[in-house]
Amino acid sequence: MSDRIRVRYAPSPTGYLHIGNARTALFNYLYAKHYNGDFVIRIEDTDKKRNLEDGETSQFDNLKWLGLDWDESVDKDNGYGPYRQSERQHIYQPLIDQLLAEDKAYKCYMTEEELEAEREAQIARGEMPRYGGQHAHLTEEQRQQFEAEGRQPSIRFRVPQNQTYSFDDMVKGNISFDSNGIGDWVIVKKDGIPTYNFAVAIDDHYMQISDVIRGDDHISNTPKQIMIYEAFGWEPPRFGHMSLIVNEERKKLSKRDGQILQFIEQYRDLGYLPEALFNFIALLGWSPEGEEEIFSKEEFIKIFDEKRLSKSPAFFDKQKLAWVNNQYMKQKDTETVFQLALPHLIKANLIPEVPSEEDLSWGRKLIALYQKEMSYAGEIVPLSEMFFKEMPALGEEEQQVINGKQVPELMTHLFSKLEALEPFESAEIKKTIKEVQKETGIKGKQLFMPIRVAVTGQMHGPELPNTIEVLGKEKVLNRLKQYK
């Protein structure tokens, strides 16, 4: 194992980048960068049936969008390639042959039906299902007989008996497994493709991976991988298994859970900021010292400490994600947020597909109005409904405000002044409201609340003069005149 910190993120190109996998990649990235090490991306693409045509491209594209720059991968060979498992068979095969020659592995000719029957019988007896070793000591004659029947063998690793496999997990502490609870396991499938636990151990060794940091659903894989290291006399890497991510019901985040968007692509499409998502994901199962929760990527790299990875499940808090993204939204210049929001405004037919300069100017004013409130760029559409839809029926509280005895006088004065106002801009609108206040003697909530309710149908919202400007003179006058 190398003295240099070398970690890997090893996705399968079977789907889009999931939040859980993004967290695995992010923690590996922070760990590597904190120690001036290497962040490697390896593609585990041996499951051809499940691989998606654009699965690999999607992984790289979304990692890059998040700001996770890799040091080595299919596009950056640093002498440890190939970086796709499907291209490493020439590395695996001599090692498979070596294990067979040393009797550390053997061919198993049992059919899927026979294995399933064994499994069902074990479950019926209340036993933990595991392979019983029926083909562990076949004679040459028996092997020839099975092959004459056309049976394709898998290759199983011969698990040493009465042995304890222990490792010091950087998150969980010491973890031990009794080898007697692990049946001889398949290292090469009947189609000749190495299994995950065999290939990953080989790849980690030859790529000189120093630390394997992954989700704790991989804990049970670790003893099998250690067996491979020991079989070849290699030193295993250090292991760290991160806690699960759970939903509001404290259940493991499932891809079937419709309450939470779980793919990076979905957050991109909604108009979340990559640095905000990076920040949020970095706090899923890891915590800094102190109370601060907003950090740049560079700050995270500097303060990252693997000892602060949590043993407890990480709660995916949608409200917190919205808050974090809002913090970043407020820091951005309006033009950046507008460019993020523009596709959403066009998709909702609120701005033409080929907008004029006037349309764009209006859109920028709309964003400036709501930027401090927006949780994500796409939220501009529901936030700004009052600009495009008919006024909703007023609620009871709004009705009380608009029925105030001062309202007819207020609306008459305001309507008259706004009708004559040019230019119809927020600074002039603000002056006009002050003039109405002086002329009528109506002030405070008695002044502002009825105006807001009359033009927006809401009790609260952004700056009133700015809102009136963005609504436009025609719409504002139409809404005011019914209350004169």
From Swiss-Prot:
Protein family according to the UniProt entry: Belongs to the class-I aminoacyl-tRNA synthetase family. Glutamate--tRNA ligase type 1 subfamily.
Full protein name: Glutamate--tRNA ligase
InterPro entries with a match to the protein in the record: aa-tRNA-synth_I_cd-bd, aa-tRNA-synth_I_codon-bd_sub2, aa-tRNA-synth_I_CS, aa_tRNA-synth_I_cd-bd_sf, Glu-tRNA-ligase_bac/mito, Glu/Gln-tRNA-synth, Glu/Gln-tRNA-synth_Ib_cat-dom, GluQ/Sye
Pfam families in alphabetical order: Anticodon_2 (PF19269), tRNA-synt_1c (PF00749)
UniProt-listed Enzyme Commission number(s): 6.1.1.17
Native organism: Staphylococcus aureus (strain COL)
Stretch forming the signal peptide: none
Keywords recorded for this protein, A-Z: Aminoacyl-tRNA synthetase, ATP-binding, Cytoplasm, Ligase, Nucleotide-binding, Protein biosynthesis
A biological process term (GO) from this entry: glutamyl-tRNA aminoacylation
Residues that bind ATP: K255
MF (Gene Ontology): ATP binding; glutamate-tRNA ligase activity; tRNA binding; zinc ion binding
SUPFAM superfamilies per UniProt: An anticodon-binding domain of class I aminoacyl-tRNA synthetases (SSF48163), Nucleotidylyl transferase (SSF52374)
Motif ('KMSKS' region): 252-256
Lineage of source species: Bacteria, Bacillati, Bacillota, Bacilli, Bacillales
Assembly description: Monomer.
